Amino acid sequence: MKKKSSQFKINYQYREYHYKPEELELSSPDKPPVELAKIHNSENVLGLILTFYVSFAVPARKTAQILRDVFCIKVSHQTVLNYAAGAAWYCHRFNLKHKGLIDDISAGDETYIKILGKHHFVFFFISAKNLKITAYHLADNRGTQPAVIAMNEAIRTASDDQKITLVTDGNPSYPAGIHFINAQFDGATTIHHKKVIGLQNLDAESEEYRSFKQHIERLNRTYKYHVRPAAGFNCTNGAVSLTTLFVTHYNFLRPHMSLQHQPPIPMLELKNLPTIQARWTKILSLAA
């Protein structure tokens, strides 16, 4: 029996990524043209704006109306947006500095938003036990590069001897990105990856790690609730700014029932402050 010469050929694809450090930088808000210390309104007004616009997910125009009709404070909706953008620049540094250690298992996913009518994607990672957001990154695609950026930040504060497992869906960008990250460690550290596929547990791995995937899905729903009033964004910086402020609110201000009504990252400096606006202004003072 004559056999074809190609019968036993094995075909496979191999990809090797070569990213420069400047290509793996987190998305961050632009530095504001006006310092918050020089604004015409008081710190309390700034705190109220962030309380309504971010913590309570009130649109910018309605936030301005509440301040005018309830507190007799005259600000425009553009002032609300400008103050939020200015605060986000400080809060981004605050988020990174005070993230702290991470759990052994983190879950990640991406969700879409619209900027100028086009889809963009926000990558999130959340710690399994303390439920804090360990990474956030905005990109115009769901490829390997933004996945690497988000995962690099997610594991940045891990201890040297920690065994890290990242749980994601079936997006091939994540295993490709983990392959790149592990190659940078030269075998000194190995990041493990677990996939949760679909809505039903059709394999043992999906069944075992489904609960971790549900953490990130709930986070995505909470994020969508907070950005929905914006009805899309007119610029990338606006999207990055609101995402950054959402992370500050989620990690440091928002009480979680499963954490005994404490935020994921409790801070002594915020504990005894009675109002949300006071906590916002305290965060900004700590970040300055």
For the regions a protein language model found, what residue spans apply to each?
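Basic, short loop/linker segments at the boundary and entry of helix-turn-helix/winged-helix-like folds
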Residues: 1-54, 72-76, 101
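DNA-recognition alpha helix
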Residues: 60-73
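Short, basic alpha-helical nucleic acid-contact segments in DNA-binding proteins
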Residues: 74, 82-101
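Active-site beta-loop-alpha junctions of metal-dependent nucleic acid enzymes
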Residues: 85-86, 136-160
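Two-metal-ion RNase H-like nuclease active-site motif
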Residues: 101-115, 124-126
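C-terminal domain-tail junction helix/linker
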Residues: 229-288
